[in-house]
Amino acid sequence: MKDAVRDLVREALERSFADGTLASGHVPDIVVEKPALEEHGDFACTAAMLMAKAEKKAPRAIAEIIITHLNDRESLVESVEIAGPGFINFRMRTSAWCRVLRRIEREGGDYGKSEAGAGKKVQVEFVSANPTGPLHIGHGRGAAIGDTICRLLAAIGWDVTREFYYNDAGQQIANLALSVQARCLGVEPGGPLWPTDGYQGEYIKDVARSYLNRETVDAGDQHVTAAGDPHDVEAIRRFAVAYLRREQDQDLRAFDVGFDVYFLESSLYAEGRVDDVVQRIIAKGHAYEQDGALWLRTTEFGDDKDRVMRKSDGSYTYFVPDVAYHLNKWERGFIRVVNEQGADHHSTITRVRAGLQALDAGIPKGWPEYVLHQMVTVMRGGEEVKISKRAGSYVTLRDLVDEVGRDATRFFFLMRKPDSQLVFDIDLAKQQTLENPVYYVQYAHARICSIFENAADKGVVPPTVDQASLESLGTPEELTLVKLLSSFPEIVEGSALNFEPHRITYYLQELAGAFHSFYNKNRVITEDADLTGARLLLLHSTATVIRNGLGLLGVSAPEKM
């Protein structure tokens, strides 16, 4: 509907230029927004105020000219008025709003989608957990956010590649191997022989047991059979990484999250990509030796101080392989890359971007883009839950999904902006009441399905979209529903382009609330066949949009609850 109003204003301006009542000939960016106050109409346009300087006229005078040149051929507009300094306020006819129901019925599961990103490629990297233990709730929030961003971008036409980067190299992996070896040898955590910084969760015992039993693990492109030798640390490392990759993959599949590409950090070293990046930076003159270490002049690219790339012991700091990895992304042709990560990665952003700029490879500043999510606090009975027996020191994603279910877990993870801290109330997530946000939305869908069952039991046949007498609609509750339904495509596009999945959860809760309000105040099946048919069509469209919205979140839309 906004587009229709925008087109009306644009055409009015073109007619004004043609007859000379406006002289500049410049059509501004026509902004149409929903007014803050309902009494100001359905839409407000600021074009007159934006044109005042170029036209050398008062905004209200320009607004009057625009209004007189409007040609509402399709009878969309009920009234137009000038407000304040020059806002043009539009109130739309009920018949215009009801057109959206025909569109929803025509497009069905595609309603909300667009081609805004058609022909464009984007790579989204998310989760990218170290294969050193079970996925924790922070990984879970990142998985929900990243997966939904992918769904949203795909919905508006982008060609999306989902990627998981396995940090299977470095000291953490060495600590993992030593921890599993200790368990293989019967060493208990806390004892004098337990490795420094060893992993203490119960899952380490599971890995050790499987290794000693010479089990075979398939994880992605890895097929590893355990050697069973407790003294072969390298064999233990290979098996442990594959074992935990498999565990993480299983948890993600259960969470309805999948990937197109799994990229191993170890491959960067095996192919010499890390060394190559360092040599290229040196050759470009952006590195120097000091105190036995190799430094990158990150201050040349906006950092507050230079950073060490290669330590005095010859090992690389953690951001150097990240630079090599992102160069690889660029070389694979991904002009747009989005990294969804925990907020603890914030410090690496400037360093990675500086390293990429130092390569002088044509990579634009500010590449890649980042979405950082804040921590999750899990509450039960008013107290924070911190420990998982299996993981030893944190709550796992599997713990949460097993207790409250996939739908509630995903929806709750997506109820706040990524950069806002999230309190996950287990008790609320398990409630089958309208106080539970995901239940509230799903129940609206199930309730609509039950209305159609009831109609069928009474022999009421819902009309087709062409048969329905939509002019019968007009109560405040009906109009609220229709207006919300019409805004769904805009909500989807805004959520996608701004990487803000929480907008969908907000919208669905508002839509469910509007439905419940309608249902409490209006009978659906009445003695008036035309009104019954129109209301059934309205509810069918509402169910379609709820289902489409939940699908974008990776949440089911049950027909019975």
Swiss-Prot record:
<keyword id="KW-0067">ATP-binding</keyword>
<dbReference type="InterPro" id="IPR005148">
    <property type="entry name" value="Arg-tRNA-synth_N"/>
</dbReference>
<keyword id="KW-0436">Ligase</keyword>
<dbReference type="InterPro" id="IPR001412">
    <property type="entry name" value="aa-tRNA-synth_I_CS"/>
</dbReference>
<comment type="similarity">
    <text>Belongs to the class-I aminoacyl-tRNA synthetase family.</text>
</comment>
<keyword id="KW-0030">Aminoacyl-tRNA synthetase</keyword>
<dbReference type="InterPro" id="IPR008909">
    <property type="entry name" value="DALR_anticod-bd"/>
</dbReference>
<dbReference type="GO" id="GO:0006420">
    <property type="term" value="P:arginyl-tRNA aminoacylation"/>
</dbReference>
<protein>
    <recommendedName>
        <fullName>Arginine--tRNA ligase</fullName>
        <ecNumber>6.1.1.19</ecNumber>
    </recommendedName>
</protein>
<dbReference type="InterPro" id="IPR035684">
    <property type="entry name" value="ArgRS_core"/>
</dbReference>
<dbReference type="GO" id="GO:0004814">
    <property type="term" value="F:arginine-tRNA ligase activity"/>
</dbReference>
<dbReference type="GO" id="GO:0005524">
    <property type="term" value="F:ATP binding"/>
</dbReference>
<keyword id="KW-0963">Cytoplasm</keyword>
<dbReference type="Pfam" id="PF03485">
    <property type="entry name" value="Arg_tRNA_synt_N"/>
</dbReference>
<dbReference type="InterPro" id="IPR009080">
    <property type="entry name" value="tRNAsynth_Ia_anticodon-bd"/>
</dbReference>
<keyword id="KW-0547">Nucleotide-binding</keyword>
<dbReference type="InterPro" id="IPR014729">
    <property type="entry name" value="Rossmann-like_a/b/a_fold"/>
</dbReference>
<keyword id="KW-0648">Protein biosynthesis</keyword>
<dbReference type="InterPro" id="IPR001278">
    <property type="entry name" value="Arg-tRNA-ligase"/>
</dbReference>
<dbReference type="Pfam" id="PF05746">
    <property type="entry name" value="DALR_1"/>
</dbReference>
<dbReference type="GO" id="GO:0005737">
    <property type="term" value="C:cytoplasm"/>
</dbReference>
<feature type="short sequence motif" description="'HIGH' region">
    <location>
        <begin position="129"/>
        <end position="139"/>
    </location>
</feature>
<dbReference type="InterPro" id="IPR036695">
    <property type="entry name" value="Arg-tRNA-synth_N_sf"/>
</dbReference>
<dbReference type="Pfam" id="PF00750">
    <property type="entry name" value="tRNA-synt_1d"/>
</dbReference>
<comment type="subunit">
    <text>Monomer.</text>
</comment>
